[in-house]
Amino acid sequence: QRLSASYDLMYRLGKDYVKPEFGIPFVDINGSEVAIREVIEVNKPFCDLLHFKTFCDNAATLETLKALPAVLIVAPLSGHYATLLRDTVKTMLQGHKVYITDWKNARLVPLSDGEFHLDDYVNYIQEFIRHVQATHGHCHVMSVCQPTVPVLAAVSLMASRGEHLPLSMTMMGGPIDATKSPTAVNNLAMNKSFSWFENNVIYRVPTNFPGAGRRVYPGFLQHTGFVAMNPDRHLKSHYDYFKDLIKGDNSSAESHRQFYDEYNAVLDMDADYYLETIATVFQDFKLVKGTWDVVSESGDIERVRPQDISHCGLLTVEGELDDISGSGQTKAALKLCSGIPASNKSHYEVKGAGHYGIFSGRRWRDMVYPQVQAFILAHHSSAKARKPKRRVSASTR
């Protein structure tokens, strides 16, 4: 038993982890089993807009589903796949129509598809918001960690142009103002020069991948950084897994496997996007200083002005024990969005929660989700959502 456990542990420590599946075949809504089918509605070179379409034979439940708010969840592009938010998606599906940004592994994107910049990220988000609005007549946006910054930029630019805005924004555990309560992640970016990152962590994709020759920040480096933040915790977890295998505790061992199958699956990021994020967010603090310019899809240079946002609810969420995005970093969005009335802004600190606890696990489901759901519903029911352009029939879209 001990020998078998040793082989199993060594295999898992050395294996190559592939992109996980969301694996949400159905959810229970009001006692009815609602089937889920993943559909790619917008296919971009570096990201798919994934829609979790719902299907149900129960007429009453179907009517309920049709009336639910449509939410675009913007997943982080910071090393892990969007499936890291599996629990977020599964919970949100109980009361919302759910879309998510499914970011692609840059090593699989051919050079012929061009580069990917932080500006492109912002433009992608705007395109996805418009798509959801065109489909449902409205959109709510929820961003988790890294994307809080480009999402705020995207909505700010839409506001400055006078576009139809999302009805609400929920921003969770993100570095809106990385100068507040700096964490180890912030300090690394602030204490190293831009050229250090360019010269030490950027590599070209090997020839055996579709993206051969592309400059990337490799996922394995990001994963090493994740583990280095809490080495004792990961070491103990692997040792506990080894003991569970010896004892024959298959349930605990399987929980370990599921977590690390997700945690160890990482993607490469395009070098331009990664380096520009380091400079813009963690070194120059352009968002909070009001000096961030974005090149639009049409080639125009536009200044990011969060103060131009007015007709949009804003909820910020922080974990009390978050060691990635420090206290006050996400809450800073409330001050930046000075054009939003105080009555439409709210902040929630999750007691006892670390970074991952605000979007996954018991605290997310029992503490955070009720706050998010109530905020979205409050701004959904009070707004006059435009009617969908396409008729909704057997599917809830």
Segments predicted by a language model, with ranges:
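Short, surface-exposed "cap/lid" segments of acyl-processing enzymes
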Residues: 21, 25-28, 32-109
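Catalytic histidine-centered segment of alpha/beta-hydrolase-like enzymes
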Residues: 348-366
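Conserved alpha/beta-hydrolase "acid-adjacent" motif
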Residues: 323-329
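Short beta-strand/loop motif that positions the catalytic acidic residue
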Residues: 309-310, 316-318, 322
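Conserved alpha/beta-hydrolase "nucleophile elbow" surrounding the catalytic nucleophile
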Residues: 142-148, 319
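Conserved acidic catalytic loop of the alpha/beta-hydrolase fold
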Residues: 108-112, 122-139, 151-156
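Alpha/beta-hydrolase-fold enzymes
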Residues: 1-9, 136-137, 154-272
